Regions:
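Short Cys/His-centered divalent metal-binding micro-motifs
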Residues: 19, 73-95
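The −1 position to Zn-ligating cysteines in a subset of zinc-ribbon hairpins
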Residues: 9-10, 55, 76
Length: 119
């Protein structure tokens, strides 16, 4: 969660604004619709969730020895995370996301709206 807060719930690769996992789970519970679900696999998960679900991505892939700490993790949307997979930035021709300035927009992934959503 500290990765998402540091990055303002914004994908460091594409710039997509993301929703907090807690908000998405509360929203799913509130609307209780089979059309808006988070399953165990991508096939069981609504596309809107995949687009807005934040993932802590290893800049240096874990399978290549990348650490699981704030110095190697950035916020990613699920599509960017899945697309990057276990490849390095160099292999994919991507800029280092740590070189991008994080602009504090005060976007909190709608965490501040969870209480309202539950009422």
């Amino acid at each position: 969660n500290s990765v998402f807060l540091r990055d303002n719930y914004t994908c460091r690769y594409c710039g997509n604004k993301l929703l907090s996992q807690k908000f998405i789970k509360s929203f799913i519970e509130k609307i209780n619709s089979p059309l808006f679900t988070k399953g165990r696999t991508n096939l069981e998960t609504t596309g809107l969730i995949l687009l807005s679900w934040p993932v802590a991505d290893h800049v240096i892939p874990w399978n290549l020895g990348g650490k699981t700490d704030l110095s190697n993790l950035v916020t990613s949307c699920a599509p960017c995370n899945y697309g990057k997979d276990g490849f390095t930035l160099e292999q994919l021709g991507l800029d280092n996301p740590f070189n991008k300035v994080v602009i504090n927009t005060f976007w909190d992934g709608l965490d501040s709206k969870i209480k309202e959503l539950k009422s």
